[in-house]
């Protein structure tokens, strides 16, 4: 069973576009409509003056109406998997019997204490719908992959294949280092996949690290003349790292054109890739 790519869903109609000027104009127009006809010209002239108390009152009301609509929009997003974030997302995915994974536990012994590194919203958002794959007891590929990804927060990706009948090989990619999964992580995943409610009795399971293909990016970035070179370089490196992180998955390629695009931030005029 394939899961829906929620990133491709159209924006929901329940999210209302907000415009302060439109709200203010609507409120003022309604006041004019409720005014006796012989007084409308005077009210209209009053509302045209920013210093008039009536104008200030309509502005304050329009601003409060804008905040109320924004709160309604936020509440609607909080119950949608594609838009929920933080603890809203944590509560939402609990309905899938899924919880946010710990990538690196907190360390209270350091000064200052080191907070825990948790699974990102985007990764949790992608993993939650895959929980339905885990409902099968027949050992489908997607079920093995879901349970492998959910076994430990350090698992960045997992792929299951069957090289021969009744044999299952699950390759895992680590978030740490260059992606090579160490023995400890492999053992954790193997144990998670070996439960009676996960692995069919006849399946012979092998868990191993994914094969890592190392690569190097060497680029010369040409910027517009000016003193602000360092912020441009930092922005380019951050955007490149964000792209690399999205490609840190089994079977995904890193494309030269995408590297070029990632490095081309505001202030960059040309990129040469070696």
Residue ranges and their predicted role:
Residues 1-137, 232-274:
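N-terminal polar alpha-helical/low-complexity "assembly arms" that mediate subunit docking
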Residues 133-252:
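Carbohydrate-recognition loop of C-type lectin domains
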């Amino acid at each position: 069973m394939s899961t829906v790519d929620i990133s491709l869903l159209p924006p929901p109609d329940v999210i209302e576009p907000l415009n302060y000027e439109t709200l203010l104009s609507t409120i003022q127009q309604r006041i004019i409509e409720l005014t006796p006809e012989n007084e409308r010209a005077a009210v209209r002239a009053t509302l045209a003056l920013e210093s008039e108390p009536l104008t200030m009152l309509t502005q304050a009301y329009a601003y409060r109406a804008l905040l109320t609509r924004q709160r309604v929009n936020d509440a609607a997003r909080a119950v949608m998997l594609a838009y929920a974030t933080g603890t809203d997302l944590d509560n939402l995915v609990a309905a899938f019997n899924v919880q946010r994974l710990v990538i690196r536990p907190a360390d209270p012994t350091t000064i200052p204490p080191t907070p825990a590194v948790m699974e990102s919203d985007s990764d949790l958002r992608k993993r939650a719908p895959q929980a339905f794959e885990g409902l099968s007891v027949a050992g489908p590929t997607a079920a093995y992959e879901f349970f492998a990804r959910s076994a430990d927060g350090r698992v960045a990706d997992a792929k299951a294949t069957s090289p021969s009948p009744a044999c299952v090989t699950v390759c895992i990619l680590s978030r740490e280092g260059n992606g090579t999964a160490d023995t400890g992580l492999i053992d954790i995943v193997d144990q998670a996949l070996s439960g009676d409610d996960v692995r069919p009795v006849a399946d012979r399971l092998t868990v191993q690290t994914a094969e890592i293909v190392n690569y190097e990016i060497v680029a010369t970035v040409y910027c517009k003349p000016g003193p602000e070179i360092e912020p441009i370089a930092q922005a380019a490196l951050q955007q490149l790292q964000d792209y690399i992180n999205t490609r840190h998955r089994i079977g995904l390629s890193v494309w030269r054109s995408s590297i070029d695009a990632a490095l081309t931030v505001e202030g960059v005029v040309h990129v040469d890739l070696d």
